[in-house]
Amino acid sequence: MNQTIKAKLELLPDSPGCYLHKDKNGTVIYVGKAKNLKNRVRSYFHGSHNTKTELLVSEIEDLEWIVVGSNIESLVLEINLIQRYKPKYNIMLKDDKYYPFLKITNEKYPRLLVVRKVQKDGATYFGPYPDVKAANEVKRLLDRIFPFRKCGLHEKKVCFYFHIHQCLCPVVNHVDPQVYKDMTQEVKEFLTGSDKKIVKELEGKMISASDNMEFEQAAEYRDVIKAIGTLRTKQRVMNQDLKDRDVFGYYVDKGWMCVQVFFVRQGKLIQRDVNMFPYYNDAEEDFLTYIGQFYQDNNHMMPREIFIPQDIDKDSVEAVVAASQEGNLLTKAQAKAVDAKVFTAKTLKFSDQKDVEQSIVKLDKELSSEKRLSSLLAKTQIIQPSRGEKKQLVNMATKNAQTQLQLKFDVAERDILKTTKAVENLGKILGIPKPVRIESFDNSNIMGTSPVSAMVVFIDGKPSKKDYRKYKIKTVVGADDYASMREVMTRRYSRALKEETALPDLIAMDGGAGQVNIAKEVLRELGLAIPVAGMQKNDKHQTSELLFGDPLEVVPLSRQSQEFFLLTRIQDEVHRFAITFHRQLRGKNTFSSKLDGIVGLGPKRKQKLLTTFKNLKAIEEATVQEVAEAGVPYEVAERVKNTLSAPHKSDENWESIKDNVPLLKSEKS
């Protein structure tokens, strides 16, 4: 805990509000709310916590807070701040799950489409459907019944669907707008569950066609009626009232929360949404935050009813749902409370305070929270069922949340057990104590340019990225893998001895006998007795065998074993890490080398160009004016363009290596 945090902890008020934790870069990494700011914020820095909270606290370098008038106001403000800053430790809903909807467009002659995103475009949406197949099945059925427009608005002749009676082509053929409007209304009624009227009409048409001996047409009507019946049976009816509702259940265990949402449409359970995430506050409060974010997403359409468990505060749910749906999470009442009570210490600067206050002023112009809340709740009811089928639905959602969370833990425990067992078995196979900490090294260079090395660390079979290290080769000229490895290992373990930091239980070299022998020589010179193994690759650049012992021998390992899989992961990871570092360094060197010597272009201006254009090719394609706009004088921009357009001695070498030649052996090793 630094001095800034210590000073601010003494100034915390006893009021409700929101707090923002920041890292060393001033980035907001967590937003929380509290009924009592003093008690909540201080609790982070006192007492014991679980691993996740300890990790969060270890990154906190500064904090801020905003005082509000009530706990509900802090809840709504918290959601607003999370959406604004997107802190890495907060609950953030996944944005990659877009369920399909049927959309009736807001056009003169509407179309029926299957879409994945709900937009505020005046169209009417129905769904969500379990998958695209289900949505397309309903659309195909409706296409057979209603000849909705499928062609564009600028067609000059009828489309293909016109000839098979699935499009009226209203742009080419005159269609009475009222007729089209009535048809659109029938489609909407069908999609809201009122299909009895349509079935009755189809039955009448089928009988009429049969009486007129139009047997093919009668068969078509029969098939459509049958398809409607099949569609009904595919959807499980949960309630006879045919209302749209979302059913929420949640479960918490071991610092994790799982929220399960059932989508019930026209009384049928059609889909569910599952989210699991670590939580740091009170479980009920984090669940409320989840609901607030859930309904901010346009793809989560507001149903007629929302079912929630009995242990959740109903008033809070009503507040966050209302605010989320309006797209404006700070109400007028909140704005006044925040504006009047924002804490600003004279001796401490809050970098985001001005931004927060400006947002509040802007939002203060909106409608009052009371009016917005009553308007929303006139359409949507928040219900806490206490018995019957509705209570069973909430219980089912809660039970499913528990099952999903337990499944996550079971899978994780099996993976941990499997990985730990592989580490233990590897030690037995090599005849050494269990290698809890394994370190691996690899070099990377092209023709001796930008030579680098990298070290990765695996602890209990899992990568420990905080212990990874990158090395620029300092004493070796040209492409000498052995000399580079000697330098890097000497630097690594000399420093470890000097600083008395952790040493590995096993060193796994990316390479064969040559790399292993270099490692052994370095360790011998430093007086270290650490086992060294070599991970040798075949001609396809894949892990093929493990070398160990004195003299080195191939260790018999099944390619299907967990031990072999662990070694492959280590070798792939150290190679990836080294290659990535080398490419980053090579790109910077290439960029600088071509711009070196240009009068008026120093390091700062080079950095401006790199930030704006990312690479040399982008600068070459830019105009002189665009280069100047990146932050360099016009005459310097001209010199840059002239230099890049002239032949450069290293161009052929660099570009042929970078773009036209596959990875060379020295980069693969």
From Swiss-Prot:
Q: Which domain of life is it from?
A: Bacteria
Give one Pfam family.
Answer: GIY-YIG
- Compartments, as annotated in UniProt: Cytoplasm
Bias-annotated ranges (Basic and acidic residues):
648-658
Q: Which residues form the GIY-YIG domain?
A: 14-91
Among CDD domains, the record links this protein to: GIY-YIG_UvrC_Cho
The alphabetical list of record keywords is: Cytoplasm, DNA damage, DNA excision, DNA repair, Excision nuclease, SOS response
> Which portions of the sequence form the region Disordered?
647-669
Keyword DNA damage assigned: yes
The record places domain UVR at: 196-231
Which InterPro entries does its entry note? GIY-YIG_endonuc, GIY-YIG_endonuc_sf, GIY-YIG_UvrC_Cho, RuvA_2-like, UVR_dom, UVR_dom_sf, UvrABC_protein_C, UvrC
Q: What is its main location?
A: cytoplasm
**Role noted for this protein:** The UvrABC repair system catalyzes the recognition and processing of DNA lesions. UvrC both incises the 5' and 3' sides of the lesion. The N-terminal half is responsible for the 3' incision and the C-terminal half is responsible for the 5' incision.
Entry's PANTHER family?
UVRABC SYSTEM PROTEIN C, UVRC/OXIDOREDUCTASE
* Family in the record: Belongs to the UvrC family.
In Swiss-Prot or TrEMBL terms, this protein is called UvrABC system protein C
Name the species this protein comes from.
Lactococcus lactis subsp. cremoris (strain MG1363)
Q: State the encoding gene.
A: uvrC
